[in-house]
Amino acid sequence: RSLCSNGCRPKPFGGCSC
């Protein structure tokens, strides 16, 4: 999957960016 949450984007290092 490439989605973390609504309005958030997956980071290349792991985790999410909102």
Swiss-Prot record:
An example Gene Ontology molecular-function term: toxin activity
Disulfide bonds: C4-C16, C8-C18
Subcellular location: Secreted
Keywords: Amidation, Disulfide bond, Secreted, Toxin
GO cellular-component term (any): extracellular region
The keyword Transmembrane is assigned to this record: no
Coiled coil: none
Cysteine amide PTM positions: C18
Keyword Magnesium listed: no
Main location: secreted
Tissues and organs where the protein is expressed, per its UniProt entry: Expressed by the venom gland.
Family: Belongs to the poneritoxin-Ae1 family.
Protein name: U1-poneritoxin-Ae1d
UniProt lineage: Eukaryota, Metazoa, Ecdysozoa, Arthropoda, Hexapoda
